[in-house]
Amino acid sequence: FYGGFYAFAIAQVLIGIGGSLMSGSDSAIIYDTLLETNNKTSYTKIEGRSYAIGNFSEALAGILGGFLAVGSIYLPIYVQTSILFFSIPIALTLVEPTMHEENKLDRSFSAIMGVVRFAILDNAKLRWLIIYSSAMGVATLSMAWFAQPFFNQVGVPLAYFGILWAGLNFSAGLTSFNAHKFDKKGRNYSMLIYLSLAMFISFILLGFNNSLFGLIFILIIYLLRGIVTPILRNEININTTSNKRATVLSVRSFIIRISFAICAPILGYIAENYSLASSFYILAIIVGLFSLLASFRLSKLD
């Protein structure tokens, strides 16, 4: 209803606040509900399918949004706002797990910092899981950021950008939908090593393939994203208690975003002044170094 940059900026800030309030709570409610019903082994399956639905929705929205924008640039926003409205009555129907009433943390800054200290300093498994998540988060967020410049560089017609974007999100949804099949007790930390190597090699090969063939490696990165996200959330849930769960998951998300915020301008500068391939090589080093280090440390702690 209000055009201009400042209205857009305010809207983005409000969206960020809304996202931060939800951060960690959704996964924590799912896990604690399953814990309460003695069904926690189903978490990866449910989390994976929830994440898959989000990816499928984004894929569909990418296509429909393009068609709506042809009529008016504001039309996708009107439709999106209408859909978001339904989240309010849905949120009101959610039932808090009864275990959340036990051992409640104080709603104070010192209590929050205590959980941050627990996740980053006191609990070694959580620390390395968060470091691993941050490395993978930087990789996947950067790929989402660099996908369109890569499409442009290899000569993909603009008309196909939306279709490719939808296809990539759909592929992440497919692997996320089936992530529970990769989630085997006692094998996860060793499997993280293979996922790290696959991500590292994909970025290296993407840097070498400045052609349409490189789209295959972008696809692989999205497929890996669908697998690793639900499994990592499950591992973090296993290694924390219910009264700290939502905050620990929120700390994980915060560190991922901060890591990306630090890396993104540097990677963008390198892509602009040197080459996109150089950014992919640097990403390969960052992801390979931190994710492999974290996965090796986790395998020793297991």
Where are the regions a protein language model picked out?
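Juxtamembrane intracellular "pre-TM" segments in multi-pass secondary transporters
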Residues: 95-131
